[in-house]
Amino acid sequence: MQEMLEQLLTPRLVDIKTVNGFNSRVTLEPLERGFGHTLGNALRRILLSSMPGAAIVEAQIDGVLHEYSAIEGVREDVLEIMLNLKEVAIKLNETSEAELTLSKKGPAVVTAADIQLNHDTEIMNPDLVIAHLGEGAELSMKLKVEKGIGYRAAVQSSDSESANIGVLKLDASFSPVKTVSYEVQNARVEQRTDLDKLILNVVTDGTLDPEDAIKQAATVLHYQLIAFVDLKHKEIVVQEEEENEFDPIFLQPVDDLELTVRSANCLKAEQIYYIGDLVQRAESSLLKTPNLGKKSLQEIKDVLAQRGLGLGTKLENWPPSSLVSKESA
């Protein structure tokens, strides 16, 4: 196996061309024949489907009870305004959600720049037009922003807590990546001419740097394939019913997350030894940990998100008896 790996060429990063803050072209070569399409297609699919971002998920407009309304003095109807709100490229730096407001009197053109931001929020396309107001018209609304991955359809919940009259749910496209294309060209190393060169072109909405998007996509691909590196048959052990209640990932030690030494030591100081211990902690609770700042917290959240996990998860009957017995041994 080692001999085969040594025979394969190891690609190197040849060039990173930044077209602008939204667009980058990355060139990778040399690749063995066929690897250009293999890696290019895998990275493209991950970039389009699995990059975290933020989006407006709810809007509450003064005087509007449902999305089929019209607002006096406003050129656009409510449905058009909602479609425009979906195009706002918004970035949350630390928090996972935010409440924003917008208030404007006519005559005026309402743009994304009119949204009143807090210290944690940025808008990357402030010139985006949301509505046109005539003389005497007024538009006032509250907006809810959340972080997420991929696409989430608007669901009008029947729960009393979220079924408030006038709360308009929006379909949310959280992905900051707008387009991804790749090109495979011929490459040459000495006498070999049957090699690939991969050119990856990524365009984002500005909330995520294109180069960072490629790095994150490669990290996601790495974690999805790592289980195949040490592929072994594992004997299925019949455990008590209590043990089966938990996903095996919760029983893994936090060391498996490969956090920085600083973050790992902070967690151990708080007696957080397993992933199941960690996901039950709230952000506010972790921020009270000595020497664990916002940067370390973001690292923890990003690593958990790569595994489909998040903080503030409630696990009934935790910890299982097997972990309790191990810790007391």
Swiss-Prot record:
Q: What does the record give under GO molecular function?
A: DNA binding; DNA-directed RNA polymerase activity; protein dimerization activity
Q: Which Gene3D superfamilies match?
A: 5' to 3' exonuclease, C-terminal subdomain (1.10.150.20), DNA-directed RNA polymerase, insert domain (2.170.120.12), RNA polymerase, RBP11-like subunit (3.30.1360.10)
Specify whether Aminoacyl-tRNA synthetase is a keyword of the entry: no
Top-level taxon in the UniProt lineage: Bacteria
Q: Region Alpha N-terminal domain (alpha-NTD): which residues? A: 1-232
TM segments?
Answer: none
Q: Which GO terms describe its cellular component?
A: cytoplasm; DNA-directed RNA polymerase complex
Question: Which reactions is this enzyme annotated as catalysing?
Answer: RNA(n) + a ribonucleoside 5'-triphosphate = RNA(n+1) + diphosphate
Which Pfam families does the UniProt entry name for this protein?
A: RNA_pol_A_bac, RNA_pol_A_CTD, RNA_pol_L
Please state the Enzyme Commission number of this protein: 2.7.7.6
Biological-process GO terms, alphabetical? DNA-templated transcription
Whether Transcription counts among this entry's keywords is: yes
What does the UniProt record say this protein does?
DNA-dependent RNA polymerase catalyzes the transcription of DNA into RNA using the four ribonucleoside triphosphates as substrates.
The family annotation for this protein states: Belongs to the RNA polymerase alpha chain family.
Domain comment, in the record's words? Answer: The N-terminal domain is essential for RNAP assembly and basal transcription, whereas the C-terminal domain is involved in interaction with transcriptional regulators and with upstream promoter elements.
Q: What is this protein called?
A: DNA-directed RNA polymerase subunit alpha
